[in-house]
């Protein structure tokens, strides 16, 4: 079991690392490639596009040929794309490399969640996903610091060499440590009643897909809006901003690592509702601080509530979304990932397009997400009568 957890954690970490590690090098990258920083900021959207376009195919193939081949191929694509990004001399080449990095990271991301669905029951999976969320929350803080330290001695291509090195490590784990977790009966004719009951159009899966998509949209809007709120509105410098973000990351980690203990005491539904209440409270605090000229610590408190709310319920919601699918976990993971990436990218783009301020953008998604998610949690509870929801198929 430990090998599955180790490999799943490593596969997931490629996704946030490739987003955050290179950001400190953007000014130098823009200078060397004769491009503006605003032009290179599109690399974030290109990276997400690469993830989204490959997720569905990766999940479907993983359900057919196995998790391990997709993990190995995805990690190798990530390695090659990272080397290409470091060697880029033109903006277009750089964007192509970022798109290909998204392909590799997206493949690994899908496989990681499919492996956890294959090998863990519902209760353990909820705990593991909560802990995994805590680990990924620290990447946005650690990665820029590591990138800064690297660039003190080396030029910006070394950032992509570091990403390639991480991809090589993941490739080694996928080849030599990871065992195939695809259910052994997956390659045979599916005639069992359970296999026919697995549909992606059921209310429960769609409700959890919406909840997780709104959650990721909220946290990515927070990441996108926080520099403007903290530095432009509140007047903090980069050092102050880094300290605040480090504090919010610590909150996310503490809540995420406490969630497994909480799940031993409270029901999953309780944690999910608590999560949405915290996000709604964050919207109230931020709005009150804005309209009543609140001091900076009120804003910081609101930002902390966002991280606490997301960390409290996201792992549980992801676990519940995957629970109906013992035979199609790869496709289920793909659909969840695509919904999360596309909803986040569209919301941030659309709000920017119509000229909504960063704070209003954040408050709106907090209100919208918490209201919709609370309604779905109350109206569509987790089924308790379907035994196949908790089926953990034997792995080959």
From Swiss-Prot:
Keywords: Cell inner membrane, Cell membrane, Membrane, Transmembrane, Transmembrane helix, Transport. One of its GO terms (cellular component) is plasma membrane. The keyword Cell inner membrane applies. The chain crosses the membrane at residues 4-24, 42-62, 69-89, 95-115, 132-152, 158-178, 210-230, 246-266, 271-291, 298-318, 336-356, 361-381. PROSITE patterns: MFS, SUGAR_TRANSPORT_1. Its main location: membrane. GO terms for molecular function: transmembrane transporter activity. Residues 25-41, 90-94, 153-157, 231-245, 292-297, 357-360 are periplasmic. It is a multi-pass membrane protein. Residues 1-3, 63-68, 116-131, 179-209, 267-270, 319-335, 382-396 are cytoplasmic. Pfam families: MFS_1. InterPro entries: MFS, MFS_dom, MFS_trans_sf, Multidrug-R_MdtL, Sugar_transporter_CS. Belongs to the major facilitator superfamily. DHA1 family. MdtL (TC 2.A.1.2.22) subfamily. This is Multidrug resistance protein MdtL. The lineage of its organism: Bacteria, Pseudomonadati, Pseudomonadota, Gammaproteobacteria, Vibrionales.
